Amino acid sequence: MSEQKLAVNEYLKTDSDYLRGTIQQGLNTAVTGAFSEGDQQLIKFHGFYQQDDRDLRNERKEQKLEPLYSFMLRARVAGGVCSPEQWLAVDKIASNLTSANSIRLTTRQTFQYHGIPKRNLKTIIQDLDREALDSIAACGDVNRNVMCNPNPVESKLHQQAYAYAKQLSDNMLPHTKAYAEIWLDNEKLVTTEGEEVEPVYGQTYLPRKFKMAVAVPPDNDVDVYTNDLGFIAVAEGDELVGFNMVAGGGMGSTHGEVSTFPRLADDFGYIKAEDSLKFAEAVMTIQRDWGNRENRKLSRLKYTIVKHGFETFKAEIEARTGIKFEPRRDVVIGDRGDRYGWKQGVDDNWHLTLFIEGGRVKDLPGQPLQTGLREIAKIHRGDFRMTSNQNMIIAGVASADKEQIEGLARQYGLLGKLITETRGHSIACVALPTCALAMAEAERYFPDFLTKVEALQQKHGFLDQGIVIRMTGCPNGCARPFAAEIGLVGKAPGRYNLYLGASFEGTRLNKLYRENIQEAEILDQLDTLFAQYASQRQAGETFGNYTVRSGVVAAVNDAAKDFHG
């Protein structure tokens, strides 16, 4: 590979002194609320992105002011589990140190803050550190937050799966001390020139972000096939014995560039649970060595597997681990939604799943959600578990505490509102006004849009039938729209591409149905399709399966060939 062809980010990483760059100098510069262009790429590895309020861009430009810069900081919380004490600290930071005054639960089981001024970044990171939380590798060309099924019913199996997710997260952390030096005031360690400080990642880390998930069938709330690397738990009784390993998934694409496409992961076979770390490291290092470092649009693992071929990639994994894959075990992949309300676990404790619209934990008129979770955290003796559907589980509630927890949840509007199956299965990304990549609204618009879709379902007599609907402001796919039965991907303000045909379970992608259309046409198209579905569907047939069977869209079986074809 010619060095001249490398993407600019590769040079930035090489010259960054293991992710230090000039971040410290930028942090100390008060004349601007921004970091330098190069450091804006490096700070992602530390867990945050530079943003600005796009609603105010033109106004500030007219006033000859720089954009209203702020930062989005994302925490690393493997499996989405945190203690009530940690949640209280998270809440306090949101209230005192961010302009958004809210906490955003993400589609990868963690939380993020919006509206952080540069001067508050260090304080926030230090406050999180005091609670054993951090933002290391929450963004950047590294392994991101590892997801794990927060199954509140099979508690023993969940704990075993969570232990592996936590191991995967801890073992794939960058080794650089840059985070501790810059944000926690640790002294810079003296290293010998050429010393290997990143045994897994190397000096230039991965070509692009890398996402892992651990699923516990039949639940697929983590959307395991949309990840770069997925481990599907195989149990004997209530004991975790191994995983079906899948690799090569990813949602991101670019409008108008057919060389880019979303993809679901391939099934590679069965591995023993104790070998999962070896296999994870093998897949990551192959991607490190083989991945595209010239064109970042083609640098995810999915493109590496397509380029080299499944069998070649599989053989390389087996060569690096010294272990052969066994035939995949039969497992049932089912629902991707959360189990709302109270569920009792095998340990007799109770778990309360709360629907959080858009994942936005904020006090709203008549619904002080943030205060409600704060008050619950003050008395709760179990865990808080964030889900990949942007919701919250109050987990491990003793029977004696159940009534008090429910009373608080109802008092603060966390319970009591009727949630349809469709709304409960649907998610949206943040998009405007903070995301620099957004072409259209998502989080702010999505609830009202869903209300109109629900009205159409009611009209055609199947409001009780859940449909997975997802909306993003751009095709990068943070809310996994290409794995939704109805996917809406922003193309321009007020305009979206409409995708149809994914399976309800997340085992088939959708396909473009209409391009660059506004709300009225979207609803008109859905009205017609819903009428056909209501009269023509087979027993138990989901909407996504119907659109493929009836020929509304063709099935996407091989994304590289079928998604755009």
From Swiss-Prot:
Cofactor: siroheme; [4Fe-4S] cluster
EC numbers on record: 1.8.1.2
InterPro entries: CysI (IPR011786), NiRdtase/SiRdtase_haem-b_fer (IPR005117), Nit/Sulf_reduc_fer-like_dom_sf (IPR036136), NO2/SO3_Rdtase_4Fe4S_dom (IPR006067), NO2/SO3_Rdtase_4Fe4S_prot (IPR045169), NO2/SO3_Rdtase_4Fe4S_sf (IPR045854), NO2/SO3_Rdtase_FeS/sirohaem_BS (IPR006066)
Binding site for siroheme: 478
Pfam families: NIR_SIR, NIR_SIR_ferr
GO BP term, pick one: hydrogen sulfide biosynthetic process
A GO-annotated cellular component: sulfite reductase complex (NADPH)
SUPFAM superfamilies, sorted: Nitrite and sulphite reductase 4Fe-4S domain-like, Nitrite/Sulfite reductase N-terminal domain-like
PROSITE patterns tied to this protein: NIR_SIR (PS00365)
Catalytic activity: hydrogen sulfide + 3 NADP(+) + 3 H2O = sulfite + 3 NADPH + 4 H(+)
Keyword set, alphabetical order: 4Fe-4S, Amino-acid biosynthesis, Cysteine biosynthesis, Heme, Iron, Iron-sulfur, Metal-binding, NADP, Oxidoreductase
Cofactor binding note of this UniProt entry: Binds 1 siroheme per subunit.
Positions contributing to [4Fe-4S] cluster binding: 429, 435, 474, 478
Pathway the protein takes part in: Sulfur metabolism; hydrogen sulfide biosynthesis; hydrogen sulfide from sulfite (NADPH route): step 1/1
Main enzyme class: oxidoreductase
GO terms assigned for molecular function: 4 iron, 4 sulfur cluster binding; heme binding; metal ion binding; NADP binding; sulfite reductase (ferredoxin) activity; sulfite reductase (NADPH) activity
Family: Belongs to the nitrite and sulfite reductase 4Fe-4S domain family.
Subunit structure: Alpha(8)-beta(8). The alpha component is a flavoprotein, the beta component is a hemoprotein.
Protein role: Component of the sulfite reductase complex that catalyzes the 6-electron reduction of sulfite to sulfide. This is one of several activities required for the biosynthesis of L-cysteine from sulfate.
HAMAP family (UniProt xref): CysI
Name of the protein this chain belongs to: Sulfite reductase [NADPH] hemoprotein beta-component
Organism listed in the record: Shewanella halifaxensis (strain HAW-EB4)
